[in-house]
Amino acid sequence: QDREARLPVKPDNQGIILWGDSVAQPTTYVLLYLHGFTASRFEGQPIISDFVKEFRVNAYLPRLAAHGLQGTEAMLGMTPANLYNSAKEALVIAHKLGKKVIIMGTSTGCTLALMLGRFSQAGGCPDLIFTEY
């Protein structure tokens, strides 16, 4: 959150946590939503909110690297490596919010989700990958 606060993030484009219950504590399952290229967390709505309500799971909706920033040159610093690293970081955070991670993605988020299936450090692999498109 400190890093997010130092960046010129567009309003409502920051990463957020949706809690599956009124008590902010880890759940058995957690949903990690990875948005598509040049998109934001809103791309997956209302499916994400409905999923959280229906199954009472936590969800983490990160702002991927170089996305959601103000300015005409916001995406110029994006590379495949920093995009993938931001997805790996999101997976580590998701593992703190629940015991088993379900990844849902759209477009480029789907590609990142599949790549995370091989990620085994600091939190391990996701337990389920679901792609919208």
Residue ranges of predicted features:
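Active-site nucleophile loop of the alpha/beta-hydrolase fold
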Residues: 129-133
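Extracytoplasmic/secreted proteins, especially bacterial periplasmic and envelope-associated proteins
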Residues: 43-46, 82-89, 111
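Catalytic nucleophile-loop/oxyanion-hole region of alpha/beta-hydrolase
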Residues: 69-102
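N-terminal targeting or regulatory segments adjacent to alpha/beta-hydrolase or S9 domains
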Residues: 1-3
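Short, surface-exposed "cap/lid" segments of acyl-processing enzymes
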Residues: 8-65
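Short glycine-enriched nucleophile-adjacent loop
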Residues: 110-122
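Gly/Ala-rich beta-loop-alpha elbow adjacent to hydrolase catalytic centers
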Residues: 94, 104-113
